[in-house]
Amino acid sequence: MAAHRIRATTNNNTSLPRCKSEGTLIDLSEGVSEASLTDVKVPSPSALRLDATASFGAAREVVAIKDCCPSSFTTLKFSKGDRLYVLDSSGAEWWYAHNNTEMGYIPAAYVEPINYRDSSFSDSGMIDTVGDCNEEAAKEMDLLGEWAGVILKPTTFQNGNPFAATNSSTNPFLNGGPQSPLDQNSNEKSVDLLLFDTLAPSVPNSTSITADINGFGSGVLNMNPLSPTVGVGQTLRRDNPFFRSKRSYSLSELSILQAQSDAPQASTGFFGGLKAPAPEQFQSREDFRTAWLTHRKLARSCHDLDSLGQNPGWGQTQPVETNIVCRLDSSGGAVQLPDANISIHIPEGHVAPGDTQQISIKALLDPPLELNNDRCTTVSPVVEIKLSNMEIRTTVTLEMKVSVVVKIESRQTTEILCVRSDCKEGPYTPIPQAYIYGDMVQVCLDNLEPCMYVCVVAQSKSIAPDSTVWEHVVKKITLGVYGPKHIHPSFKTVVAMFGHDCAPKTLLVSEVGKQAQAVPPVALQLWGKHQFVLSRPQDLRVGVYSNMANYEVKASEQARVVRGFQVKLGKVSRLVYVIASRNADDVSDFTLRIQIKDDQDCILAQFCVQTPTPPPKAGPKTSVQRRFLKKKEVGKIVLSPLAITTKYPVFQDRRINNLKFGKLIKTVIRQTKNQYLLEYKKGDFVALLSEEKIRLKGQLWTKEWYIGYYQGRLGFVHAKNVLVVGKVKPIYFSGPDLTTSLFLEQILKPCKFLTYIYASVRTILMENIGNWRAFADSLGYINLPLTHFCRAELDSEPERVASVLEKLKEDCNNTESKERKSFQKELLTALLKMDCQGLVARLVMDFVLLTTAVELAGRWRELAEKLAKVSRQQMDAYEAPHRDKSGVVDSEAMWKPAYDFLVTWAAQIGDSYRDVIQELHMGLDKMKNPITKRWKHLTGTLILVNCMDALRSSAFSPAAQDDCAI
């Protein structure tokens, strides 16, 4: 529907409902604040009835006498001569109509009635016959099944108003008017908003059934089983354009369908006992209103758990399209697509002073077939741009990030193009005003249309018969791992593969099992993403493995295949994995390892993601989260021992071969020495650990850097000073070979300068390490008995791990030892040798946040303003718990509010430890006299977190899932 397409807007005022049956919560006594419509009252979605005879059958047929180009997304687009059906003509200038496909507002002056039997259109009760519906299309989109035994009963209108329901006494948001008693017959069979409430069998003798469209009985849909041979399904399917053209259905619609089915099944879902509140249960109107709102909020975030994979992990139903709608005036501005490197820049004076323009941007994940073939491949999502006001004076600029680089030897035959079309499926034509700098494409859009589609492609002018454009470019593929908001004893996760770098925060998944077609799609949240280079379209095997013995991926689903033709077409591939807990009583977050292999069984990429936590347990909650344990509490930590002892792979000390090399085109000698920034000579060669560029401030400016290995040292090298030459090792490459042991030693240099809290480290290790013997061996305590670490016999594995950690702490703090060890470095070295990459990432991020808080101390307010624009009141709130009796925070305790802020800020950034450390470094660089000038070890941690994947892929042989942990 045109009037109900907007899923998310940046407008701070009231937003439109997401679907017609979710209802609009409006208190008429308080008035309605203006949204995106100017002086146009949007009828309640409950008025968009499913009653064909009283709603769509009660429409007045009109013909368009002018073309209408929508100035708003609530306006229906039509051309001269189109037939429309007016549902509400009560407005003087705007009427509400549909065209058998969409609904929206139309200007009354642009249409005229088919006949002039009635000169006035103010009476919306006048009924004309609706045109014939497309029977074949209705049958193709038949997702409802048959409703036997009931037919629709026309609804009587009050005062000729089709939008006023007869039974409105149960609506807590309608003030005024007589409150008639509840219809007792309507209570014989209630349909709750929740799809999975237990439903009683249909009663064929009931005289009236009230279906709840917007959350409570409104009398909008009355159904009487007058004839067992006539079904409502046919009427709804053929006469209701929503049920003929919609791709998904809301919970309220599905509730009606399930309530009227012949053999409804009683649900035993996780939330099966949750019922909608009844008015008679409350003493006052306000109490009922509050309870109804609470129930509605919960109901809209839940699905029938039995029909969605038999587990409580599939309960998120938020909108998933990555889009934004914004209104700009003549001052211009920029519109940024959320969670994507796509933006539109509007110059000043784009529209006349006093005018506004509504701009919509949407990233379409699946590209059209036209843009993916042997000679062409998409390297960005298709961007849909919609403009409302076409009386414009200037052009607009679109900027987006691409995931491709043309090889040097192919730059004469292959190029990066920006193409556009007025239709999603094409045809697409190149845009001449396109500029490429690095991985960003900037294109100037003129000849603007109300709806445009723009995409960036890599195209070869001429290729050999057996080759493709993939052989001439370096293209990156993005993997996103999606799952529920909270994990449960049994849940499903989805690995999605995209042909570009845009992985949305939520992903719509509809095929979650052998379900009925009427089951709505499910929106899953992004847990983590990873990019890797793919040389050609080929079959890819994607494996998912758990690091905890308590969780296991179904053996038959550990490795799924993405076919090469899917990769070539650029379509989004969704791979579903079932993950279950061996012990349902012991549920905690854990780490997933995702491994991608090619058709030759070689590992192309592998990475780790941290799962969310289980849902919070009911109980008293403290107002302030405590992040530090008292000494007395350390021994009282409740542990969850693993079901079995975990086995770990063996660290292999060998040469790292999968490297790219670059030629240095400039000599750099630094006046201010930095052990993490390389010095080099022009003409030498450097080994590159990753093609990913990292933004970092140099001596004066923020630049892009590679992580390089040069003459035995690991560090950053300015990307503009390197000419990438390929994977073949140059003859004149100097310095020792890079081995996994040397690599490990180099990346852990900054660790001994990081601050830590021992109690926190102890707790994390006890919860995540499942084999004390492997932990001790990796620390160098090879073949030592347990009595070497503790006197008493310990029963649980976590306590044994804690005793080994205590021994390490004693050895590192021993002043009599000839070789002084660093506790942090020894610990992280052991964990990386055990392949506990996710655990290392978590510890490093904790160390970095704590160290930054200690180094900043009283200057944390300046950083808070740079990172998150924190107000003075919020800063005072962070310091309040740490003030002494005189109301002042001691200088030695100033690190505590700084740490509280950094932990809160990091949680808002997301689960990517790389992004957190990168953004923190950028924020520190923006400070006056930044601490990174004297404390350079945060730069070293950037090298560490960006090199762990390369170390892992070289140091460990592929192993069976049962023999591997992270």
Swiss-Prot record:
It is found in: Membrane, Clathrin-coated pit; Cytoplasmic vesicle, Clathrin-coated vesicle; Nucleus. It comes from the Eukaryota. GO terms for biological process: cellular response to amino acid stimulus; endocytosis; negative regulation of cell growth; negative regulation of cell population proliferation; negative regulation of GTPase activity; negative regulation of TOR signaling; positive regulation of autophagy; protein localization to lysosome. InterPro entries: DEATH_SH3BP4, SH3-like_dom_sf, SH3_domain, SH3BP4_C, UPA_SH3BP4, ZU5_dom. Residues 322-457 form the ZU5 domain. Keywords: Coated pit, Cytoplasmic vesicle, Endocytosis, Membrane, Nucleus, Repeat, SH3 domain. GO terms for molecular function: GDP-dissociation inhibitor activity. The keyword Nucleus applies. Residues 57-116, 657-727 form the SH3 domain. Possible role in regulating endocytosis of the transferrin receptor at the plasma membrane. Alternatively, may function as a negative regulator of the amino acid-induced TOR signaling by inhibiting the formation of active Rag GTPase complexes. Preferentially binds inactive Rag GTPase complexes and prevents their interaction with the mTORC1 complex inhibiting its relocalization to lysosomes and its activation. Thereby, may indirectly regulate cell growth, proliferation and autophagy. This is SH3 domain-binding protein 4. The lineage of its organism: Eukaryota, Metazoa, Chordata, Craniata, Vertebrata.
